[in-house]
Swiss-Prot record:
InterPro entries: Aldolase_TIM, Indole-3-glycerol_P_synth, Indole-3-glycerol_P_synth_dom, Indole-3-GlycerolPSynthase_CS, RibuloseP-bd_barrel
GO MF term list: indole-3-glycerol-phosphate synthase activity; phosphoribosylanthranilate isomerase activity
Protein name: Indole-3-glycerol phosphate synthase
GO biological process: L-tryptophan biosynthetic process
Keywords, in A-Z order: Amino-acid biosynthesis, Aromatic amino acid biosynthesis, Decarboxylase, Lyase, Tryptophan biosynthesis
Family, as annotated: Belongs to the TrpC family.
Reaction it catalyzes: 1-(2-carboxyphenylamino)-1-deoxy-D-ribulose 5-phosphate + H(+) = (1S,2R)-1-C-(indol-3-yl)glycerol 3-phosphate + CO2 + H2O
CDD domains: IGPS (cd00331)
Amino acid sequence: MQIRRRPNPVVAVQELRFQVKAPDATPRNILEEIVWHKEVEVEQMRERAPLLELRKQVQTAPPPRDFVAALRQAQYQPALIAEVKKASPSKGVLREEFDPVAIAQAYATAGAACLSVLTDEKFFQGSFTYLNQIRQAVHLPLLCKEFIIYPYQMYLARSQGADAVLLIAAILSDQDLQYFLKIATSLGMAALIEVHTLTELDRVLNLEGVSLVGINNRNLENFTVDLQTTCDLLSKRWDQLDQRNILVVSESGLYQAVDLQQVQTAGAKAVLIGESLVKKAADDRFSHETDRMQAKISALYS
């Protein structure tokens, strides 16, 4: 998958307006649309909070928690990264009455090893404010689930309490992946590098300093899901991953115990689950969030 960057903006010079026309000025898929919007969004973020200001906040922030160690020492196996997620482009709003802190606290009580917090506003109705609020409320390591295309976003994530960041191979060059890995390390954060294809996995295996790889069972071009993605990639590259002690996380499409067993048998040491936990069943009988999450997570590991 090759994700293009946003076409050059129109530049006004006195009475004239110039733009280098792109061959195709509309996004080809949802992932490309997200990336193009993210470029504009980050420009606006920089105006509100300059990088220099974020660097100062990072310097005075509490030290990050060890995300990878938490997965290796988890109560459940495969270790659970439970996601705080209100909506998605494919499923729309997952829950109308959405309290991110209550959900995060319920996950922690129910045995999650780490949490993932969506921060994209336009497409997932997430927020960096949610990340900060959850950091104040729970002790677990936090993954900032963001479409990172600039180092600025990594500093913002750390300033708001993130212990790990997501790097998506499909939207970053090899050079950017390696550079962003170094930035994450310098900030004390783990980097979960997400892949969907064998080509992307091979690119990641050529990088230095990789400790976490996420295999997304969802095709981000069309949002179809196939658990066999995790199984196929691990069957082809298990030896290289194992030799380097890289912990593999299976992401998306995990709804029941048999799904977890399938990816664990293939070699995944952790799973990232959001939709099936956040979404309420039609016959939901729980009055407390903690009871609901304990029941759901217990069922996944039964």
